[in-house]
C-alpha cells in the first residue's frame, strides 16, 4: 500500500485507483457494477426493468438522466439477477421471450452485451439504445453531424429534419453491416463506441444498413440495430444476437478486435463456442476484378460474409453447423449462388464462380455492381435528403451516349418529379436488329418500376415489385431486392442513326415529390 501511495502522490489520483474495486453492490432497486478498471467504470442496472440508469466513467456521469439505456424501448419489467464469477460479472434480465445480458471483465472499461430472443418484439424491430449525455458526448462518429438533429424542424415524418439549412436524420448515420465494426459518440474527454463482432442472428445480409447514432439534443443515442423494418429484405432471425460491446475510453478510438470467447463459460443462452462451429474455404472467380468481391452465407437461423482476397480466395467466419445458401457478389450484385453444408469442427472446401452475362453491348450506363454509384446525387444520398440544397438538380435529365458524363444520369427516378429519364444514342445499321434493354434497379418505393419507350415502341408494363413497406431513398437507403427488368425490342425498332429511349416511373400508388413512387438505378444496358 505504501508503494501505491507514493506512486499516486495526489489524493485525487489515489482515490480513483482505490475506488476501482471490482464487484457488485446490491440495493433493493438496483445493482451497481464496478468494472475495477483503471479509468473507473461503474454502471447501475434497475432490478425491476433492466434499464441502465447510470453510467459513471472516469468521474463523469455519461448516462442521460431522463430515460435509461436498454434493449428495445425498454422491457418494462423483467426478472433481473447479477452474479460475480471470478473475473466476470454477469447481469441477466429475463422475460418470456427475451433475455438480455450485461457482462463485465475485471479491469476493462467495457460493457459486453448479448440478446437472446425466441420471437420478434411486437414493435417489429430489435435494437439496443444507449441514451448518453449530449453535453459531454455531443459528437457522432464516423459520419459527423449528418445525424445530429438537435434544434431541427421536421420535414418528413418525425425522422428527417432541417437544421441550419441542411437536412439531417438518424438514418444518415448508417453503414453497411460488412463495414460496420465500430461506431461511436464522443466529446473532448470521453468516447463511447459500439463494437460489433457478430451479426450472425441479425437480418438483411452484408449490405444492410441501419441507424447507428442520433444526437437529438436531450441526449445522444448510440445504437445497435439487430433487425428492423427499415428496408428489410428477409425474415427476422431469432436466437442469440451478439456479443456486442460498449467500449469506454478517454480519447482513443478502440480496436474492433475484442475477444469475447469467454462467453462460452458464462452460461449464455444460445452461445455457440468455437469448437461447435465450422468454416468454408475456397476461391471465387469470374466476376469483374475492378470491384470488391463478397461471399455471403445464410439460412433461416444465421448469416455470415467475407470479402475475398485479391486472388479470389476466402475463408468464412466461424459458422454454426447447418445447410447454407452461398452467394457471390460483384460489388453488391449477385453473380452466382450455390449451397454448402457446414460441420462443427471442420473446414469445408467450396469454390464459386460467376459473372455478369448480357450480350453484344450497344451502350451501358453505370456498372452492374448493385449500387447507384457514379450517378447524379448518389455521392450525397446516403447522408442527406433528396430535397437538400446541396443536391444537384434531379432533372428531368437527358443522357447522350458518348458525350454525357455519368453524373448526367440520375441515381433515382421519381414519378412526376424527374421522369421520364431520356437516353439518346446513335446506332449503326448492324445494331437495328432485335435487342434487349436491361434496366437494373436496387430499390423500389410505393410500387415504382420502370417502363421504357424506344423510339415509337412502348415496352410492356412490368408487374409491381415486392413492397418492402419502408421509405428508402429519402432515409439514406439504396438497397432493396434489386429487381432487374428486361425490355425485348423487336427488330427494326432501333434505326440507323439517332434513337431515343425514355424511362418512366409507373405505379398504381401516388405520393408527393420525393415520396412519390420511385426506384433507384443500378445499371442500364442495351445489348443484342
Swiss-Prot record:
The keyword Acyltransferase does not apply. One of its GO terms (biological process) is cell wall organization. It comes from the Eukaryota. Pfam families: CBM-like, fn3_3, RhgB_N. Its main location: secreted. GO terms for cellular component: extracellular region. InterPro entries: Carb-bd-like_fold (IPR013784), Gal_mutarotase_sf_dom (IPR011013), Galactose-bd-like_sf (IPR008979), GH-type_carb-bd (IPR014718), RG-lyase_II (IPR029413), RG-lyase_III (IPR029411), Rhamnogalacturonase_B (IPR016590), RhgB_N (IPR015364). Disulfide bonds join 50-93, 184-193. The keyword Secreted applies. It is an enzyme of class 4 (lyase). It catalyses: Endotype eliminative cleavage of L-alpha-rhamnopyranosyl-(1->4)-alpha-D-galactopyranosyluronic acid bonds of rhamnogalacturonan I domains in ramified hairy regions of pectin leaving L-rhamnopyranose at the reducing end and 4-deoxy-4,5-unsaturated D-galactopyranosyluronic acid at the non-reducing end. Residues 1-20 form the signal peptide. It is found in: Secreted. CDD domains: RGL4_C, RGL4_M, RGL4_N. This is Probable rhamnogalacturonate lyase A.
Amino acid at each position: 500500500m505504501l508503494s501505491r501511495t507514493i506512486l499516486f502522490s495526489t489524493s485525487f489520483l489515489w482515490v480513483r485507483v482505490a475506488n476501482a474495486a471490482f464487484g457488485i453492490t446490491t440495493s433493493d432497486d438496483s445493482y451497481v457494477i464496478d468494472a475495477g478498471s483503471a479509468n473507473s467504470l461503474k454502471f447501475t442496472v434497475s432490478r425491476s426493468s433492466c434499464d441502465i440508469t447510470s453510467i459513471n466513467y472516469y468521474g463523469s456521469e455519461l448516462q442521460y438522466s431522463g430515460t435509461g439505456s436498454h434493449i428495445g424501448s425498454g422491457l418494462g419489467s423483467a426478472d433481473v439477477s447479477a452474479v460475480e464469477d471470478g473475473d466476470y460479472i454477469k447481469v441477466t434480465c429475463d422475460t418470456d421471450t427475451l433475455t438480455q445480458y450485461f457482462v463485465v471483465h475485471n479491469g476493462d472499461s467495457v460493457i459486453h452485451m448479448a440478446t437472446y430472443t425466441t420471437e420478434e418484439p411486437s414493435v417489429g424491430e430489435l435494437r439496443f439504445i444507449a441514451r448518453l449525455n449530449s453535453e459531454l458526448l455531443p459528437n457522432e462518429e464516423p459520419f459527423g453531424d449528418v445525424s445530429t438533429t438537435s434544434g431541427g424542424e421536421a420535414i418528413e415524418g418525425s425522422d428527417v429534419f432541417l437544421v441550419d439549412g441542411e437536412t439531417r436524420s438518424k438514418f444518415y448515420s448508417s453503414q453497411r453491416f460488412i463495414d460496420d465494426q465500430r461506431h461511436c459518440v464522443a466529446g473532448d474527454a470521453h468516447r463511447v463506441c459500439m463494437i460489433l463482432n457478430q451479426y450472425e442472428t441479425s437480418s438483411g445480409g452484408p449490405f444492410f444498413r441501419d441507424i447507428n447514432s442520433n444526437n437529438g439534443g436531450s441526449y445522444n443515442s448510440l445504437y445497435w440495430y439487430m433487425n428492423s423494418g427499415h428496408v428489410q429484405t428477409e425474415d427476422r432471425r431469432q436466437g442469440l444476437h451478439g456479443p456486442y460491446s460498449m467500449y469506454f475510453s478517454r480519447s482513443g478510438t478502440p480496436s474492433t478486435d475484442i475477444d469475447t470467447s469467454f462467453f462460452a463459460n458464462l452460461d449464455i443462452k444460445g452461445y455457440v463456442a468455437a469448437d461447435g462451429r465450422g468454416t468454408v474455404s475456397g476461391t471465387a472467380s469470374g466476376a469483374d476484378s475492378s470491384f470488391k468481391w463478397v461471399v455471403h452465407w445464410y439460412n433461416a437461423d444465421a448469416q455470415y460474409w467475407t470479402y475475398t482476397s485479391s486472388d479470389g480466395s476466402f475463408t468464412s467466419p466461424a459458422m454454426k453447423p447447418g445447410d447454407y445458401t452461398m452467394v457471390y457478389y460483384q460489388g453488391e450484385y449477385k453473380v452466382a449462388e450455390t449451397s454448402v453444408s457446414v460441420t462443427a469442427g471442420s473446414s469445408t472446401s467450396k469454390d464459386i464462380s460467376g459473372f455478369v452475362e448480357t450480350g453484344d453491348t450497344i451502350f451501358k450506363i453505370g456498372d452492374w455492381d448493385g449500387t447507384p454509384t457514379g450517378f447524379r446525387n448518389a455521392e450525397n444520398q446516403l447522408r442527406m435528403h433528396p430535397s437538400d440544397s446541396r443536391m444537384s438538380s434531379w432533372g428531368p435529365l437527358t443522357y447522350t451516349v458518348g458525350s454525357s458524363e455519368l453524373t448526367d444520369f440520375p441515381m433515382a427516378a421519381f414519378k412526376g418529379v424527374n421522369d421520364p429519364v431520356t437516353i439518346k444514342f446513335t446506332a449503326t445499321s448492324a445494331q437495328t436488329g432485335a435487342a434487349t434493354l436491361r434496366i437494373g434497379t436496387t430499390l423500389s418505393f410505393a410500387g415504382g418500376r420502370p417502363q421504357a419507350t424506344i423510339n415509337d415502341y412502348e415496352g410492356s408494363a412490368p408487374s409491381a415489385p415486392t413492397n418492402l413497406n419502408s421509405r428508402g431513398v429519402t432515409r439514406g437507403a439504396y438497397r432493396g431486392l434489386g429487381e432487374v427488368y428486361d425490355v425485348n425490342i423487336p427488330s427494326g425498332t432501333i434505326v440507323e442513326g439517332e434513337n431515343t429511349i425514355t424511362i418512366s416511373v409507373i405505379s398504381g400508388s401516388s405520393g408527393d415529390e420525393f415520396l412519390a413512387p420511385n426506384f433507384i438505378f443500378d445499371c442500364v444496358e442495351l445489348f443484342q
